[in-house]
């Protein structure tokens, strides 16, 4: 049968729409990734799972996919949820909280990035084509900020550089927030810059020479704002027109609203066509909270430690649940509806995943035996897969998709004798279902594309340009006798895994190790 039409809910238009890629049958999208200051919780991963399912569904209908998913390792302020120009960087606050565990802020970022990637793999999420890190694109971000100032979409104060919300039309369109609602949000700001022109204006660059992660800029030492990071990384790899952008509903305002303002000011036109957001997750009917004891990271549930007393006994006593069971449980609510995560849901998911695994073991044993006989399952399993794919194309209706797919497991279970032909049909169905839903068996991809275009430990081209720019700044500082600034630039490069060598013929560098 022909592939069904892939439809998703577009936050920008408030409509469920057919997804029509700019390039025919090639979906190009950006996914907001984690801020690596703590272990990611199951609500975070529900959003990342949505992006993974978009990818799998697009591939199932024959499309090519290019996905960019970032790592935020600088610039996400504690008050960025409120468009606060002040507040404290989440990375810096994390180091204050856990300073004894880490030598410096880069070690902290490396630790939580590695943990995030481990959790990502455990939940069977496919790797994006590019996973850029904000700290590797600071030069690019500076260039964007300079351009916004030149175009009079931004202005400077003693505290930094701000985007002028008044300079763009339709700010608030994505979220539906009126100007009054935007102003109400800013009333909760912790730190305010008296030189801001409009309370709604947000930071593009923060002037702070004392910040633990800082770079030289035309406005002095400081660091980039969170919103400009994603705008720059998205357009760096996907161009100034791409199909889709994903994230959690908490990012609609202000983060994605700010991204749209920046993107359109830089490009001069709409950059992203579809905005897809995952709704919040509750645990046992309540907001997830450490104070309530219902705050779960992924590793709390798949590999709890002996001191993780907040983890339910039914999970801790068995050493954690199968990661695929957690993935399956998170799929029991459609992404754009609030989801109540319960232990009952988790344990039911574990039983269903075990049935898939038992069926796969039985099928593989039958394949090895390869007994003669007619195919008794192909005709039953093909329409089951079609129904599963139709549900996924219907705005990622994962509850309907997993229910349909379970009928395929039942069909295998109810087949008394699996001959070779029947087993081949069953294995084909299992493989196709796993490619679509990712709940049958772990996938082990050979090309783990965890860094932005890196291959064999070599720095990607865009990073090489940034490094050369930093080295030029360092040489200028040394020539001017500003040795402290030159040393700070060298420290920044070394923390990024770049070894700087001063030779009689000039300064050279090489990539020593990957960050994170």
From Swiss-Prot:
<feature type="binding site">
    <location>
        <position position="255"/>
    </location>
    <ligand>
        <name>Zn(2+)</name>
    </ligand>
</feature>
<dbReference type="Pfam" id="PF23493">
    <property type="entry name" value="CysS_C"/>
</dbReference>
<keyword id="KW-0547">Nucleotide-binding</keyword>
<keyword id="KW-0963">Cytoplasm</keyword>
<dbReference type="InterPro" id="IPR032678">
    <property type="entry name" value="tRNA-synt_1_cat_dom"/>
</dbReference>
<dbReference type="InterPro" id="IPR056411">
    <property type="entry name" value="CysS_C"/>
</dbReference>
<feature type="binding site">
    <location>
        <position position="259"/>
    </location>
    <ligand>
        <name>Zn(2+)</name>
    </ligand>
</feature>
<feature type="binding site">
    <location>
        <position position="230"/>
    </location>
    <ligand>
        <name>Zn(2+)</name>
    </ligand>
</feature>
<dbReference type="InterPro" id="IPR024909">
    <property type="entry name" value="Cys-tRNA/MSH_ligase"/>
</dbReference>
<feature type="binding site">
    <location>
        <position position="32"/>
    </location>
    <ligand>
        <name>Zn(2+)</name>
    </ligand>
</feature>
<dbReference type="GO" id="GO:0006423">
    <property type="term" value="P:cysteinyl-tRNA aminoacylation"/>
</dbReference>
<comment type="subunit">
    <text>Monomer.</text>
</comment>
<keyword id="KW-0862">Zinc</keyword>
<dbReference type="InterPro" id="IPR014729">
    <property type="entry name" value="Rossmann-like_a/b/a_fold"/>
</dbReference>
<dbReference type="InterPro" id="IPR009080">
    <property type="entry name" value="tRNAsynth_Ia_anticodon-bd"/>
</dbReference>
<keyword id="KW-0479">Metal-binding</keyword>
<keyword id="KW-0436">Ligase</keyword>
<dbReference type="InterPro" id="IPR015273">
    <property type="entry name" value="Cys-tRNA-synt_Ia_DALR"/>
</dbReference>
<dbReference type="GO" id="GO:0005829">
    <property type="term" value="C:cytosol"/>
</dbReference>
<feature type="short sequence motif" description="'HIGH' region">
    <location>
        <begin position="34"/>
        <end position="44"/>
    </location>
</feature>
<keyword id="KW-0648">Protein biosynthesis</keyword>
<dbReference type="Pfam" id="PF09190">
    <property type="entry name" value="DALR_2"/>
</dbReference>
<dbReference type="Pfam" id="PF01406">
    <property type="entry name" value="tRNA-synt_1e"/>
</dbReference>
<comment type="similarity">
    <text>Belongs to the class-I aminoacyl-tRNA synthetase family.</text>
</comment>
<dbReference type="GO" id="GO:0005524">
    <property type="term" value="F:ATP binding"/>
</dbReference>
<dbReference type="GO" id="GO:0004817">
    <property type="term" value="F:cysteine-tRNA ligase activity"/>
</dbReference>
<dbReference type="InterPro" id="IPR015803">
    <property type="entry name" value="Cys-tRNA-ligase"/>
</dbReference>
<keyword id="KW-0030">Aminoacyl-tRNA synthetase</keyword>
<feature type="short sequence motif" description="'KMSKS' region">
    <location>
        <begin position="287"/>
        <end position="291"/>
    </location>
</feature>
<keyword id="KW-0067">ATP-binding</keyword>
<dbReference type="GO" id="GO:0008270">
    <property type="term" value="F:zinc ion binding"/>
</dbReference>
<protein>
    <recommendedName>
        <fullName>Cysteine--tRNA ligase</fullName>
        <ecNumber>6.1.1.16</ecNumber>
    </recommendedName>
</protein>
<feature type="binding site">
    <location>
        <position position="290"/>
    </location>
    <ligand>
        <name>ATP</name>
    </ligand>
</feature>
